[in-house]
């Protein structure tokens, strides 16, 4: 078995407030789940903001995209999916049944 580098999100600790979405009547989430989702959302918004603020060719910024030097052969056939679309489809399928 070969080991390959693991990509990870690096969070710089900045926190901003974000609007809370109204709860859906069919979905009940624990406070811990909501906090995890909020943390990931805020962290990703910070990453996107930092990426937009970086000057191409300038000095190294806060955010750096990780790219493997040697691609993992197991991922050769990997096709990215839109998670929002997947959730939408699974929700529609659940309502049909």
Swiss-Prot record:
Phosphorylation by MAPK3/1 (ERK1/2) regulates MCRIP1 binding to CTBP(s). InterPro entries: MCRIP. Disulfide bonds: none annotated. The modification Phosphotyrosine is found at residue 41. The modification N6-acetyllysine is found at residue 79. A motif (PXDLS motif) lies at residues 80-84. It holds the Pfam family FAM195. Keywords: Acetylation, Cytoplasm, Nucleus, Phosphoprotein. GO terms for biological process: regulation of epithelial to mesenchymal transition. The modification Phosphothreonine is found at residue 30. The modification Phosphoserine is found at residues 21, 24. One of its GO terms (cellular component) is cytoplasmic stress granule. The keyword Heme does not apply. Signal peptide: none annotated. Residues 1-30 are annotated as: Disordered. It is found in: Nucleus; Cytoplasm, Stress granule. The phosphorylation status of MCRIP1 functions as a molecular switch to regulate epithelial-mesenchymal transition. Unphosphorylated MCRIP1 binds to and inhibits the transcriptional corepressor CTBP(s). When phosphorylated by MAPK/ERK, MCRIP1 releases CTBP(s) resulting in transcriptional silencing of the E-cadherin gene and induction of epithelial-mesenchymal transition. Belongs to the MCRIP family. Interacts (unphosphorylated form, via the PXDLS motif) with CTBP1, competitively inhibiting CTBP-ZEB1 interaction. Interacts with CTBP2. Interacts with MCRIP2. Interacts with DDX6. This is Mapk-regulated corepressor-interacting protein 1. The gene is MCRIP1.
């Amino acid at each position: 078995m070969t080991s390959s580098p693991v990509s990870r999100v690096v969070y710089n600790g900045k926190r901003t407030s974000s609007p809370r979405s109204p709860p859906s009547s069919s979905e009940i989430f624990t406070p811990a789940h909501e906090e995890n989702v909020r943390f990931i959302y805020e962290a990703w918004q910070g990453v996107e903001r930092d990426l937009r603020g970086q000057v191409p060719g300038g000095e190294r910024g806060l955010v750096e995209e990780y790219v493997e030097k040697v691609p993992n052969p197991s991922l050769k056939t990997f096709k990215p999916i839109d998670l929002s679309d997947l959730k939408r489809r699974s929700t529609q399928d659940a309502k049909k049944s």
